[in-house]
C-alpha cells in the first residue's frame, strides 16, 4: 500500500522551508467500503493491487476502509469492488480541500472572540492568535515558546492557572496536531484555551477547574508538518525530519515515543505513514515535548494528559501497544471516558465510543499515551479522535469547528469535575 506521504514526494523531496506547489487532489475521490468477513481480504487486495492510499485501512473484518482513489484509477477500482456497499466521503477531494482552506485573514492585536473559530487559519496566524489571547489575560496565563521544530518553527503553548498562582497545582496537558493533517484538533484545543481563559470567574465549573489545575495546552505539536499541509500536501501526517538513506522524509511522531517502540503498531519503513523513526525518541519535536513534560511534572506532577486526534469520534485509554494488558488504573480511565462521552453527546447528540486504544481503534506502538502513563507516571493518560466518523474525515468543513469545540469542552469539563471530586 502506498502511503499518503509518498504523494508529497511528487511535490517535494527535501526538508526545507521553501514554498512548494501544492499537490492537486482535483478529481480524487474518497470512498468508504465497510468490510465484513466475506470481503475484507478482497478489499485489502484491491488496495494493494491498485497501490491506493487509505485514511483508514481495514486490518480486520468489521472495520471501514476509507480509500483515496485518483481519477486514473476510478474505473478499475469501481470494477474491483462491484457488488460491495460503498459510501462517498468526498466526490471531489480537491474541491473539498479548496473550500476548507479558504482562510479568513487575522490581524495581529485583534481581541480574540468566537469569530476565530469560524475558519481554519495559517500556522503563522495561530501564533499571533495565541499571543493575542494570552495578552488579554496576562495575570493568569503565559504564552510559551516551548521549543523549536526540526525546521526551526516555534512549538507554541499556553500556560493557564487560577487562584493558587503559576505552577501551584497538578498539571493538565493537552496536545493537538501531532499528526499534521488533523486540523480540527488545532482549533478545538484553542477553543478550550479560549474558554478556560474567557470564562474564568464567569462559569463556576471552569473556574473550579482552572483553580484546581495548572493547564498546559500545546495546540500545534508538529508545526513543520502542519505548515506543509497548508502549502504543499493537505494530507501529510508525519513531521518533516529527513531520514538518512531514504527518499521519504518524516516520522510519525505518535510512534516515536521511547516506550514499547517496536511492534506491529508501527512501521520500520520510512515511507510508511506510521514510520517509527530510526531510534526511540529521535524525532526533534518529541525531544522537545518530552523535555517540556518532564519539566512540568517536576513541579506538582501531571494529573492528566490528553492527546487530541481526528477522526473517528472515540475517547480512549491505555494501552495502545497491547490489546490484552491493562493498567492498574483501567477502571478509573474507563469511568472518566464514559463521563466525557456522555457529556459531549448531550450538547449536539454526537456519539463517541470509548475503550482501550488497541481494542477500540488499532494497535499502536511508541505512542504518547502509553509513554505518559508508564514512563512519566502521569496519573491519567487518554486520547481522543474528534469529529467525524468519516463523512468528511480529515477534511472537516469549517462550520463544524464551533460545534466540535462546544461539545469537546463540555466533555472535558465533566471529566475534570469528576477528577476533582475524586
Swiss-Prot record:
Q: Report the PROSITE patterns cross-referenced here.
A: CARBOXYPEPT_ZN_1 (PS00132), PEPTIDASE_M14 (PS52035)
Query: Which EC numbers characterise this protein's activity in its record?
Result: 3.4.17.-
**Cysteine pairs bridged by disulfides in the record:** 248-271
Q: Where does substrate bind?
A: 179-182, 237, 254-255, 310-311
Q: Which GO terms describe its cellular component?
A: extracellular region
Q: Which cofactors are reported in the record for this sequence?
A: Zn(2+)
| Keywords assigned by UniProt, alphabetized | Carboxypeptidase, Disulfide bond, Hydrolase, Metal-binding, Metalloprotease, Protease, Secreted, Signal, Virulence, Zinc, Zymogen
> Which processes are annotated in GO (biological process)?
proteolysis
CDD domains with a match to the protein in the record: M14_CP_A-B_like (cd03860)
Location of this chain's protein in the cell: Secreted
What does induction of this protein depend on?
Expression is strongly increased during growth on protein-rich medium. Expressed at even higher levels when keratin is present in the protein-rich medium.
Instruction: Identify the propeptide residues.
Output: 18-112
- Tell me how the cofactor is bound: Binds 1 zinc ion per subunit.
This protein's major location comes to secreted
Q: Secretion signal: which residues?
A: 1-17
Q: Which residues form the active site?
A: 385 (proton donor/acceptor)
| Binding residue positions for Zn(2+) | 179, 182, 309
- Give residue ranges for domain Peptidase M14: 119-419
A single Pfam family it belongs to is Propep_M14
What the protein does comes down to: Extracellular metalloprotease that contributes to pathogenicity.
Family according to the record:
Belongs to the peptidase M14 family.
Identify this protein by name. Answer: Metallocarboxypeptidase A
Organism lineage reads as:
Eukaryota, Fungi, Dikarya, Ascomycota, Pezizomycotina
- Gene coding for it: MCPA
